[in-house]
From Swiss-Prot:
GO molecular function: dihydrolipoyllysine-residue acetyltransferase activity
Compositionally biased residues, Low complexity: 204-214
UniProt keyword annotation of Transit peptide present: yes
Taxon lineage: Eukaryota, Viridiplantae, Streptophyta, Embryophyta, Tracheophyta
Top-level division of the source organism's lineage: Eukaryota
Protein name, as recorded: Dihydrolipoyllysine-residue acetyltransferase component 3 of pyruvate dehydrogenase complex, mitochondrial
Length: 539
């Protein structure tokens, strides 16, 4: 009766599911046993009328699992608008992957297994940075359970339902937790907390055997076979002598013989067809006594150039940066276009605007803010560069979202300024400063870095780098590398006249599958036009 009452209470909590679906975009997944696969019901019909995708029914081979709806809430209230955005930039849900179970036994009351959420498009695993709740604490919807370190940033993970935190499966500091792997258990009733003290989630138990699988032993046995040749087969050496003057030996045997000044012609091989192997060299050195004199000198030489070093573990952001950039260089056919842009008028306009900003107490506008604005307007003129490659088609985006590279102590981040072509310089400057600060504090949220269609990387202003080539940020088709401005002598009007002008080199890296050379040159021409005539950006 106690379990029946719990099921009835839980059913009451779910009576407003239809209302919840009206307020939030959600995907409902019902778990049925193999013997209880239900047909479409009223909620399925309701979801289809709202335009949600068909519900996925997953059978779990368990006789102790009852059909219960589990709701994964998304971060946006309008899913249809997100579908028009880049596929890699849509608002990914901070999914708290969970599974609710009811046990027929007395040791397992109703509980919920909370899995590692998928917090970014590229996330496959995460780390538990900090638990904000302890075992036994009461939790409510919207409260933060823990902080998860993703491949992009550290994100707070919120609780979805009311209850009590019965068990923390993955302790604080746990690393490389696969998406969906159970990290905590919650229960509805406080008295059920103690029953999960020694509980091991089924997903964790299932994963253990795969990790514990030892490396097969046969390959190691093959290595032992060669040096284990006994001395007895020496009698068979003359039966397979090498023909001619050529001496057949393995590369390792040749190297060992060379290091110890051993003539190969003095050794008869015991390998296939009389081939000299390492065991033959070792036996020769042992019998002649050369091994004792030659090896100490080698070890003495090897100790002399000893290196002092420290091994730094890979952070999550470093792993993702390495894998994405390696993927980019290996799969994207890069080409590079460089042009010099005169920035005298740009610097003059910036000085005028900053004088107005200072008078009104506002923040100054940086050269990088003007570069971001010019890049966004050039993308509006040449939309082919605002695209992405897929195997079946080229996707051209209507939104101009500019990622801005920010270097921090934790690694490289690329937060995004969305709809940069429609924003003013002050707004762009404020957003870039805010995003850069959040990146340095490691507090970026998924919506702060997802959805970019083009990237700007500036090493000129902060570091004085004259010119460089950046790696395309997949799945984007282009990235702009901005160098430092320098004064140059340029010809004047007369034959003996000259002037000074400041030039800033920029290099456009393109994906040749999407952007042809002429299209990339057209974009650079448009960008240069905005930089050299900056007032046109204000129109």
């Amino acid at each position: 009766m106690a379990y029946a009452s719990r099921i009835i209470n839980h059913s009451k909590k779910l009576k407003d599911v239809s209302t919840l679906l009206r307020r939030e975009n959600a995907a409902t997944i019902r778990y049925y046993s193999n013997t209880n696969r239900a047909p479409l019901n009223r909620e399925d019909t309701f979801n289809s009328r709202l335009g949600y995708p068909p519900l996925e029914r997953i059978s779990i081979c368990s006789t102790s699992t009852l059909p219960v709806s589990i709701i994964f809430s998304t971060t946006r209230s309008n899913l249809s608008s997100a579908m028009g955005r880049p596929i890699f930039g849509k608002e990914f849900s901070c999914l708290m992957q969970s599974a609710r179970g009811f046990s027929s036994g007395s040791d397992l009351p109703p509980h919920q297994e909370i899995g590692m959420p998928s917090l970014s498009p590229t996330m496959t695993e995460g780390n538990i940075a900090r638990w904000l709740k302890k075992e036994g604490d009461k939790v409510a919807p919207g409260e933060v359970l823990c902080e998860v370190e993703t491949d992009k940033a550290t994100v707070e993970m919120e609780c979805m339902e009311e209850g009590y935190l019965a068990k923390i499966v993955k302790a604080e500091g746990s690393k490389e937790i696969q998406v969906g792997e159970v990290i905590a258990i919650t229960v509805e009733d406080e008295e059920d907390i103690g029953k999960f003290k020694d509980y091991t989630p089924s997903s964790t138990a299932d994963a253990a055997p795969t990790k514990a699988e030892p490396t097969p032993a046969p390959p190691k046995e093959e290595k032992v076979k060669q040096p284990s040749s006994p001395p007895e087969p020496k009698a068979s050496k003359p039966s397979t002598p090498p023909t001619g003057d050529r001496v057949f030996a393995s590369p390792l045997a040749r190297k060992l013989a060379e290091d110890n000044n051993v003539p190969l012609s003095d050794i008869e091989g015991t390998g296939p067809e009389g081939r000299i192997v390492k065991a033959d060299i070792d036996e020769y050195l042992a019998s002649s006594g050369k091994g004792a004199t030659a090896k100490p000198s080698k070890s003495t030489d090897s100790k002399a150039p000893a290196l002092d070093y420290v091994d730094i573990p890979h952070s999550q952001i470093r792993k993702v940066t390495a894998s994405r950039l390696a993927f980019s260089k290996q799969t994207i056919p890069h080409y590079y276009l460089t042009v010099d842009t005169c920035v005298d008028k740009l610097m003059a306009l910036r000085s005028q605007l900053n004088s107005f900003k200072e008078a009104s107490g506002g923040k100054r506008i940086s050269v990088n803010d003007l570069v971001v604005k010019a890049a966004a307007l050039a993308l509006r003129k040449v939309p082919q560069c605002n695209s992405s490659w897929t195997d079946d088609y080229i996707r051209q985006f209507k939104n101009v979202n500019i990622n801005v590279a920010v270097q921090t102590e934790n690694g490289l981040y690329v937060p995004v300024v969305k709809d940069a072509d429609r924003k003013g310089l002050s707004t762009i400057g404020e957003e870039v400063r805010l995003l850069a600060q959040k990146a340095k504090e490691n507090s970026l949220k998924p919506e702060d870095y997802e959805g970019g269609t083009f990237t700007v990387s500036n090493l000129g202003g902060p570091f004085g780098i004259k010119q460089f080539c950046a790696v395309v940020n997949p799945p984007q088709a282009a990235i702009l590398a901005v160098g430092s401005a320098e004064k140059r002598v340029v010809p004047g009007n007369g034959p003996d006249q000259f002037n000074f002008a400041s030039y800033m080199p920029v290099t456009l890296s393109c994906d040749h599958r999407v952007v042809d050379g002429a299209i990339g040159a057209e974009w650079l021409k448009a960008f240069k036009g905005y930089i050299e005539n900056p007032k046109s950006m204000l129109l």
